[in-house]
Amino acid sequence: LDGGHRAVGAGRCHSPASGGGAEEEGMAPPICWSVEVRGLSQSSSFIICSLQGIVKDMKSLTPHLLLCSFFTSIAPALGEGFRNKRVAFIPTAAAHEEYTAYVDSARSSWKELGSNITDVDIARMPLRTATEALEQAEIIYLSGGNSFYLLDCLRSTEIDQIIRGRLAEGAILVGESAGAIVCSPNIAYIQPMDRVPDNYSQADYTGLNLVDFFPVPHYLAPPFVKSSKEVVAQHASLPLELMNNAEAVIVEGPQRTKISSEHQ
């Protein structure tokens, strides 16, 4: 899956237009961030608003993972932990998609954060070169696209093991749409929303298993209104994490924080 609205074929979606009303006298419209924090023993929620769209309270968060539907909608709220960093940008999931504007959108958002970006196409780049780029990166970004193709590439190249090692060393993983889905224990659940390529080479759909929940990006967002409901209906027994195109989940050890941005 990729981050957005329009569909070109089954299991694909495309970048949403930025939400909100017209700007007035050069001032950005107010942005409300709804934040739900869930830990092992407590649950709380609160609302933070910022005219500039920068949530100061979020700047203290340095997560292991950030999983989202559409990175560009979340990027304005990210604090110093995401700014001026070396980013290994993995666009591989979108390699065979007809519409890839969401990849360019994410790349632009990273540049606005002052990132030093290195493109790492794990399906085409020599393994040694890709490994070196990942070892130097402070943040590893997995783009949207086809979840099954991305997982196949990650596992067949054993880049999944390299990513796991980098996270243990303190790197941050950001997964957008398909990039979020592959972090789950097993991605079979997402088939109503995404297609399995004919040349998928793995024996199963075991994911990276970096989180103990199952992200459902683009929940109730066109063109996935019906298919996202099907995922929920078919897998109600799983700990699903529903995210619309303005939501993300930040994972810090046993605690996960869900944030939501909406132009008001």
For the regions a language model picked out, list residue spans one by one.
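Class I SAM-dependent methyltransferase SAM-binding "motif I" and its flanking Rossmann-like core
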Residues: D152-C153, I159-A221
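N-terminal beta1-alpha1 cap of cysteine-dependent amidohydrolase-like domains
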Residues: M58-I139, S143
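A contiguous loop/helix-start segment that scaffolds small-molecule binding in enzyme catalytic cores
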Residues: P239-Q264
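Conserved anion/nucleotide-ligand pocket segment
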Residues: P215-A246
